[in-house]
Amino acid sequence: MSKVAKYRRQVSEDPDIDSLLSTLSPEEMEELEKELDVVDPDGSIPVGLRQRNQTDKQPSGSFNREAMLNFCEKESKKLIQREMSVDESKQVGRKTDAKNGEEKDSDASRKAPGPRQDSDLGKEPKKGVLKKSFSRDREEADGRGGEKPKEEKVIRGIDKGRVRAAVDRKESGKDGREERAAAARKEEEKTGSVKNAGLSRDKDKKKEEVKEPSKKEEVKLTAESRNTVGRREDGRLKESSKENKKPEDEGIGSGGRDWRKEDEKVKKEENQPDKEVREESKTKAPEKQAPSCPNKPSDGQARAEEEAAPSIFDEPLEKVKNNDPEMTEVNVNNSDCITNEILVRFTEALEFNTVVKVFALANTRADDHVAFAIAIMLKANKTITSLNLDSNHITGKGILAIFRALLQNNTLTELRFHNQRHICGVKTEMEIAKLLKENTTLLKLGYHFELAGPRMTVTNLLSRNMDKQRQKRLQEQKQAQEASGEKKDRLEVPKVGALAKGSPKPSPQPSPKPAPKNSPKKAGVPAAPPPPPPPLAPPLIMENLKNSLSPATQRKMGDKVLPAQEKNSRDQLLAAIRSSNLKQLKKVEVPKLLQ
């Protein structure tokens, strides 16, 4: 309200404004303060705090935190209930499978022949039956405590061993059946999900299928371990019964046979679901391949491009094979659809071509096979002058093969093989420098050597080749000039008519050998002698030339050793004047100008 007070002081002269301000409500006063803040900012407040906060707004939507938390709790409870229901359904399925297995085993034991004890052992009793049997054994032991303790102990041990073996078989059979049932249900659920789910679920199914065989292997190992334990116990029981009673031995033997038969049945039952799982996996394979078909149009497009590539390069290949005079350059740089086979076909066609001078295949994914084909082509081809192999997959072996082929090639002047996928290395660079010493035609090499030694040697060799090419060019020019001069001399023939008239003027360029037919009247007169040859230049003294090129210090040292040079006319005149006397001089009249 301080700013409003200031504003009131400023406008206190006008009573109408005071009355208006007094009638304003507090909300209107706040709005007025905001407007005054904008109109007349306070200099004492920092610049960043002078403007009102324009980001303070009321929430546009109704946000309730409690409602959101309640919703999250409900969703989490639903998920937990779903998981619990799935587990319960699995447990119920396992129980039903166990009951079915018990019924089957009881039927098999009833059919099996043998004494009563063995038939009872063949059955798989329930938990209540097992408890009753244990209680009966205890009562019998208490009642007959004084009579035949040794025999009772043996019988109890035999019964206990049989009961334990039966319990172990039960547990192993139940576990195997429960796991089989669970695996079968999972497979059924997977088949339903394959039909209904999209392509995104295929990956999860593959992972589950990979896990299933590992689980089955674990189940097999546990079942085998339990069977081995049961067999060991059976062997021990047999030995103890043989020592005590023979009839019991016979019963135990029959029971062991029954147990073996049951073990074989269990193994067969375990093998059957494995076979069924394999058959189902085979049937599922085509079903899984069917939904993955829409993901393969890219492969079809790539194949179509590869098939279309040969059609694109058929025409240039035919032109190269037929030595088309218009086809002087083969440039397939940066072509995406070209393959190594097509590049090899190009090199084979260029082997006997006499027109193409430039072969460029940069960034075409060419490998060592193409490099070896190019090496063979360079040995036979004598017209290609430029070869570009930049940005490819050629290794040191392919590059060395090309340089060895250059020993038999005298036409290639430019070779580029920079920016390969594989580094050439120290050994290949040294070999390149050695091989280039025997080549005298290569002028440009597109490669940056990593080592300083090969780099300097190659630059020196290339400059040597440049000098040799320049010398050859100069020699060719001289030979051409001499040949043209000889042709001009042969073409210049003197005019017959002018000499027949007997003109006294000689020709400006007299021929050294005049023809005898030119002057029939003067046949007896001897021919005029040819003009004297021009004077030869004075011979150069090699020592003087050496002194002129040597530094001044050496020249001073060798001045005394130099021979006397020939004197010119001025020097001779001055020497004669110095050696003459007044008596020898002749009197000469003074010219009039000097008088």
Curated annotation (Swiss-Prot):
Residues 27-40 have a biased composition (Acidic residues). It is found in: Cytoplasm, Myofibril, Sarcomere; Cytoplasm, Cytoskeleton. Residues 1-69, 81-322, 467-568 are annotated as: Disordered. Its main location: cytoplasm. Keywords: Cytoplasm, Cytoskeleton, Phosphoprotein, Repeat. Sequence repeats lie at residues 165-179, 180-195, 196-211, 212-226, 227-240, 242-255, 256-271, 272-288. Residues 505-517, 527-538 have a biased composition (Pro residues). Residues 569-588 form the WH2 domain. InterPro entries: LRR_dom_sf, TMOD, WH2_dom. SUPFAM superfamilies: RNI-like. Detected in aorta, urinary bladder and uterus (at protein level). Detected in smooth muscle cells. Detected in aorta, bladder, colon, intestine, stomach and uterus. Residues 165-288 are annotated as: 8 X approximate tandem repeats. Residues 81-110, 117-127, 134-192, 200-223, 230-249, 257-287, 467-476, 484-493 have a biased composition (Basic and acidic residues). The modification Phosphoserine is found at S12, S85, S135, S550. GO terms for biological process: actin nucleation; pointed-end actin filament capping; positive regulation of actin filament polymerization. One of its GO terms (molecular function) is tropomyosin binding. One of its GO terms (cellular component) is myofibril. Residues 503-522 are annotated as: 5 X 4 AA approximate tandem repeats. Required for proper contractility of visceral smooth muscle cells. Mediates nucleation of actin filaments. Belongs to the tropomodulin family. This is Leiomodin-1.
